[in-house]
């Protein structure tokens, strides 16, 4: 969404779908007059009664966009080729993307010893070389622009986590209905 948010328009408002998204936009796009929070996902309608689990026609409905890992990595390679003409910058950017992918997939240890997700912003801040960033080695000097360039890595990680949850549910033999673009690509 970065290309649409960078312009310092007068009276510019945005809507965020979660609190982290809201904080992110407020931090990196201070020219926005207001960022409103609109909780869309997993929100219960006040107009309808909750159907008891045993009476539901669809026991578990899983919504999402599903893509193949190889396809997403190829899209990232294509983005590198398209965005960076200089082979050195292209390789620096690709290597940074792969390092980010590893860090995000590995997660981090929480205070109670469990593995938890690392948000892209935190993971990238931990691995990006600030001197290289300020020198433009990754094709930009702006951290928000760099994160936008790397959106496919974040998408890859979210997709991998989605597949992991689906595999877990399938292993439990819970009846599952998948809905969303690319659902047929899910190998269950």
Stretches with model-predicted labels:
Residues 4-15, 28-30:
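A conserved, positively charged/aromatic
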Residues 18-188:
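Nucleotide-sugar donor-binding catalytic core of glycosyltransferases
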């Amino acid at each position: 969404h970065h290309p649409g948010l960078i312009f310092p328009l007068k009276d510019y408002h945005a809507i965020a779908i979660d609190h982290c998204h809201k904080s992110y936009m407020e931090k990196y796009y201070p020219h926005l007059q207001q960022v409103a929070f609109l909780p869309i996902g997993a929100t219960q309608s006040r107009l309808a009664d909750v159907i008891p689990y045993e009476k539901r026609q669809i026991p578990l409905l899983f919504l999402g966009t599903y893509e193949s890992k190889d396809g997403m990595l190829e899209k990232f390679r294509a983005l590198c080729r398209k965005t960076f003409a200089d082979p050195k910058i292209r390789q620096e950017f690709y290597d940074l993307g792969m390092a980010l992918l590893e860090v995000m997939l590995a997660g981090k240890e929480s205070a109670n010893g469990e593995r938890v997700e690392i948000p892209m912003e935190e993971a990238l801040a931990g691995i990006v070389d600030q001197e290289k960033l300020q020198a433009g080695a990754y094709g930009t000097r702006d951290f928000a622009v760099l994160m936008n360039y790397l959106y496919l890595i974040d998408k890859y990680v979210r997709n991998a986590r989605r597949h992991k949850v689906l595999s877990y549910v399938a292993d439990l033999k819970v009846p599952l209905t998948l809905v969303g673009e690319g659902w047929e690509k899910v190998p269950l």
